[in-house]
């Protein structure tokens, strides 16, 4: 067996075999290129692509961009969800609000009134009779408002997809921002969905869009 050696290091034996069994294999650096006889070896390395954010065109747009960052920071740090538990997924939603996961440390506080909420968590099976109530609660929420679809039943009907009394996805009634798969999804999955919603809010540019009109 060959002896492995690196520059600056002494050769060592493997499994007690002598170095005379085979030729020594020199360790190659990570960034060293392999020399080949083909024409591709003479081609220069391509530069890495860099995503450069567009610079503000004026001072006013710069101020508006900073205001957007400030508003988005305050908005994503104080999400107040409206509980809309419809089935077994609501148990995991309550589990996330319990001390084990402590959702309050992310600024997420459940509210009982839709007029004080900016997030709706649709947890469970949405039936045809419950659909008008869901839309009514959504219309009572102030702007900007977000919807989290929790579980397979809320996403697309789930186990009751072919039932005559079930809406095949709550996105047919209200616009959905975050989909959380699972039957039911765990509390960790719901918490991850809330964190993804915070990332989405961070990238919003509502004031810049208003300023450019």
Swiss-Prot record:
Keywords: 4Fe-4S, Disease variant, Electron transport, Hydroxylation, Iron, Iron-sulfur, Leigh syndrome, Membrane, Metal-binding, Mitochondrion, Mitochondrion inner membrane, NAD, Oxidoreductase, Primary mitochondrial disease, Respiratory chain, Transit peptide, Translocase, Transport, Ubiquinone. InterPro entries: NADH_UbQ_OxRdtase-like_20kDa, NADH_UQ_OxRdtase_20Kd_su. [4Fe-4S] cluster binds at residues 88-89, 153, 183. Hydroxylated at Arg-111 by NDUFAF5 early in the pathway of assembly of complex I, before the formation of the juncture between peripheral and membrane arms. Residues 33-44 have a biased composition (Polar residues). The keyword RNA-binding does not apply. Its EC number is 7.1.1.2. Residues 1-38 form a transit peptide. Residues 31-53 are annotated as: Disordered. GO terms for biological process: aerobic respiration; electron transport coupled proton transport; mitochondrial electron transport, NADH to ubiquinone; mitochondrial respiratory chain complex I assembly; proton motive force-driven mitochondrial ATP synthesis. It is an enzyme of class 7 (translocase). Binds 1 [4Fe-4S] cluster. GO terms for cellular component: mitochondrial inner membrane; mitochondrial matrix; mitochondrion; neuronal cell body; respiratory chain complex I; synaptic membrane. One of its GO terms (molecular function) is 4 iron, 4 sulfur cluster binding. It comes from the Eukaryota. Its cofactor is [4Fe-4S] cluster. It is a peripheral membrane protein. Changing residue 145 to H: Found in a patient with Leigh syndrome; uncertain significance; decrease in enzyme activity. Belongs to the complex I 20 kDa subunit family. Core subunit of the mitochondrial membrane respiratory chain NADH dehydrogenase (Complex I) which catalyzes electron transfer from NADH through the respiratory chain, using ubiquinone as an electron acceptor. Essential for the catalytic activity of complex I. It is linked to Mitochondrial complex I deficiency, nuclear type 3: A form of mitochondrial complex I deficiency, the most common biochemical signature of mitochondrial disorders, a group of highly heterogeneous conditions characterized by defective oxidative phosphorylation, which collectively affects 1 in 5-10000 live births. Clinical disorders have variable severity, ranging from lethal neonatal disease to adult-onset neurodegenerative disorders. Core subunit of respiratory chain NADH dehydrogenase (Complex I) which is composed of 45 different subunits. This is a component of the iron-sulfur (IP) fragment of the enzyme. This is NADH dehydrogenase [ubiquinone] iron-sulfur protein 7, mitochondrial. It comes from Homo sapiens (Human). The lineage of its organism: Eukaryota, Metazoa, Chordata, Craniata, Vertebrata. The gene is NDUFS7.
């Amino acid at each position: 067996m060959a002896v492995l050696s690196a520059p600056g290091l002494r050769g060592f034996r493997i499994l007690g075999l002598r170095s005379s069994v085979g030729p020594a294999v020199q360790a190659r650096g990570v960034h060293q290129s392999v020399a080949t006889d083909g024409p591709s070896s003479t081609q220069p390395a391509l530069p890495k692509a860099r995503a450069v954010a567009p610079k503000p065109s004026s001072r006013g747009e710069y101020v508006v961009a900073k205001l957007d960052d400030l508003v988005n920071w305050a908005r994503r740090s104080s999400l107040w969800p409206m509980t809309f538990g419809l089935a077994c997924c609501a148990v995991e939603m309550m589990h996330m609000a319990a001390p084990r996961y402590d959702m309050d440390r992310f600024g997420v506080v459940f509210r009982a009134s839709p007029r004080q909420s900016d997030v709706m968590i649709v947890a469970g099976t949405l039936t045809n009779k419950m659909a008008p109530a869901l839309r009514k609660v959504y219309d009572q929420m102030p702007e900007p408002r977000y919807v989290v679809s929790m579980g397979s039943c809320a996403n697309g009907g789930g186990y009751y997809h072919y039932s005559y009394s079930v809406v095949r996805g709550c996105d047919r009634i209200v616009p959905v921002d975050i989909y959380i798969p699972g039957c039911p999804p765990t509390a960790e999955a719901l918490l991850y969905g809330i964190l993804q919603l915070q990332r989405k809010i961070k990238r919003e540019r509502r004031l810049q869009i208003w300023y450019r009109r």
